Design a protein with these regions (language model features):
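Low-complexity, highly charged intrinsically disordered N-terminal segments
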Residues: 1-7
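Structured beta-strand/loop patches that form or line metal/cofactor-binding pockets in enzymes
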Residues: 9-19, 277-283
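Short, solvent-exposed loop/edge-beta patches enriched in aromatic
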Residues: 16, 27-33
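Short solvent-exposed loop/turn micro-motifs enriched in small/polar/acidic residues
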Residues: 17-20, 289-291
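Residue-level marker for buried hydrophobic side chains located in beta-strands
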Residues: 21, 32-34, 232
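Hydrophobic residue at the +6 position relative to the catalytic HRD Asp in the kinase catalytic loop
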Residues: 23-25
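Domain-scale recognition of functional cores that engage charged ligands
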Residues: 28-30, 42-48, 53-341
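Activation of the activation-loop gatekeeper triad in protein kinase-fold domains
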Residues: 38-39
Length: 341
């Protein structure tokens, strides 16, 4: 996209700050953890929402520690305070925070708005249609993006330049490049990884990532996918929240074939469909056999450990039932035997 490249060219004049991003991974039938995508369109994705997982984990440990009058104090390993301190620190001494948002549904704003306000910051939200006429109001504050790519690309050069100069979180490179699922294809290209990783690091990354193919790349694999839908999954390269994601085993033959006929596949990436491990879980007394999608919470060059996991009876979460899981890091058998997973 020419417009996108123009914005990225101007952004390249500024040192890269990744902002917040959330790599997601699946668990294969063999137990391998495999990265499937990175969510980084919106600031704070997972950073704040995982607070609820910390609370649930704390309650769980307190409950089993007080059973039978044992009074055991099971420690909770959590990076909650560390990650909240970091997202407060990056605002610096700016007292005003401006959130620029699209119509996309997100629960994060409802969490980080009161968080920053509790620390004496004033938080104001501008809908996408109000962003351009309020440049003079937001450009001197700490600017947070909750804008999707379509809205960002609709803004004038003056508006995107103001976002760059304001040091908007997230950086356009994070929004347009890291969030784009085509980025994962580069992890398997020596010409790319040789510039930033050692051979050992590249091999490790590839062993924990799902191979990702671009349209027009490896025609043999794309043709195999067209014939054998159950072995593959198609994903729109830009969208999130499982929008325009077609898992072969869950997609009827006509819908699958139609994506080739009308050219939709040209805007998609292709991945092998990973057969995932199922976990027996109990939710409000009902037994489920769930797939698990894990997440990694990251900000700039820092990794803040696991956030809130998602569980679903379908191999693609967000397209059907969607439940939440709180991770607890422990090697204590007294805790492990009480956990669902």
């Amino acid at each position: 996209d020419l417009r996108e490249m123009e914005i990225l060219d101007r952004q390249s004049r500024v040192p890269f700050r990744a902002g917040t991003y959330r790599p997601d991974y699946l668990v294969s039938e063999k137990g391998d953890l495999l990265l499937c995508e990175i969510t980084s369109r919106f600031f704070g994705h997972g950073i704040f929402m995982s607070y609820f997982a910390d609370c649930a984990a704390e309650r769980f440990l307190r409950k089993i520690g007080t059973e039978d009058g044992r009074g055991i104090d099971f420690p909770l390993y959590s990076t909650l305070n560390e990650r909240l301190q970091y997202v407060l620190q990056i605002t610096g001494d700016k007292k005003e925070i401006y959130v620029l948002k699209s119509a996309d549904k997100t629960g994060e704003i409802a969490l980080y708005k009161p968080f920053y306000e509790a620390w004496g910051k004033r938080v104001e939200i501008f809908e996408a249609e109000d962003v351009e006429r309020n440049i003079d109001r937001w450009k001197k504050g700490f600017v947070i993006s909750a804008l999707n790519q379509k809205d960002l690309l609709s803004f004038s050069d003056g508006t995107t330049e103001a976002m760059i100069e304001a040091g908007m979180y997230n950086d356009f490179r994070t929004i347009f490049l890291i969030h784009d699922k085509r980025f994962m294809n580069l992890w398997f290209q020596d010409a790319f990884t040789d510039r930033c990783l050692t051979g050992e690091e590249a091999a490790f990354l590839r062993s924990h990532a799902i191979p990702t193919y671009l349209y027009g790349d490896r025609d043999d694999i794309w043709q195999e996918a067209r014939r054998n839908k159950d072995g593959f999954i198609l994903k729109h390269h830009r969208l999130g929240k499982s929008e325009k994601v077609y898992a072969g085993p869950l997609t009827d033959k006509r819908t699958w074939e139609k994506m080739w006929e009308n050219g939709d596949v040209q805007n998609m990436v292709l991945q092998p469909f990973i057969r995932q491990r199922k976990y027996p879980t109990v939710w409000e007394g009902t037994l489920f056999e769930d797939y698990i999608c894990g997440m990694m919470l990251c900000a700039d060059d820092r990794y803040f450990d696991s956030g809130m996991f998602r569980a679903s009876s379908l191999p693609v979460t967000n397209v059907g039932d969607d439940r939440k899981v709180c991770p607890i890091h422990t090697d204590d058998p007294r805790i492990m035997q009480r956990a669902d997973i």
